[in-house]
Each structure stands twice: as C-alpha cells, then as structure tokens.
Amino acid sequence: MEIKQIAVAGSLESSDMMITISPNDGQGIVLELDSSVEKQFGNHIRALIKTTLARLGVESATIEAVDKGALDCTIQARTIAAVHRAAGVEHYNWKEIDSWNA
C-alpha cells in the first residue's frame, strides 16, 4: 500500500497510542517511538508496528508513534487506521485483517 499523505490515528490519552504516518519517498520504514513503557516493551511495540505495516504492504513510510501504555490490539488498530487514511483507502478488507488473528 502506498502512503500518499500525512495521516494520524489515535490520541494521547492513557492506554492509547497516537500514530502519525507520512510518505518516505522509497527510503524504507523509519519508525520513531516515544513510549512510557519503552524499557519494558519498546522492542515488542516496534516489531508489532512493523509487522502490521508489512501485512498491509507498506514498504516505505515515516512513522512517529507516541505510546501511552496501549495494548497490542490498540497498537494494531491505530496503525491500520493511520495507514488506510494515509493511502486514501476508504474501504477496509476486513476478511484479510481478520485472517491475521488465526
């Protein structure tokens, strides 16, 4: 999926995450994480975001993630929403997304 514009999903409330995604002109994935639980879960959060991006077919993007203790399901949901908004996609392929949980 091609990232065409800047998009944001989520909030800075407790137990949530704000993801900002923008085009990166073919330079791969650049991920910046600011997390209140960085020392404990930083590597896991980065891996989860990158896995979600890969499943969506995103090969190049700049991602700024501000985590306030979000659960995995919230991190995935915010990443999916931000990618679809940034790519200009209006309809989600729920069957594909649901298959990730198998």
Curated annotation (Swiss-Prot):
GO cellular component: cytoplasm
Pfam families xrefs: ACP
Main location: cytoplasm
InterPro entries: CitD, Mal_deCO2ase/Cit_lyase_ACP
Modified residues (O-(phosphoribosyl dephospho-coenzyme A)serine): 14
Keywords, in A-Z order: Cytoplasm, Phosphoprotein
Domain of life (superkingdom): Bacteria
Location(s) in or outside the cell: Cytoplasm
Sequence similarity: Belongs to the CitD family.
Role: Covalent carrier of the coenzyme of citrate lyase.
Known partners and oligomeric status: Oligomer with a subunit composition of (alpha,beta,gamma)6.
Full protein name: Citrate lyase acyl carrier protein
UniProt organism field: Streptococcus equi subsp. equi (strain 4047)
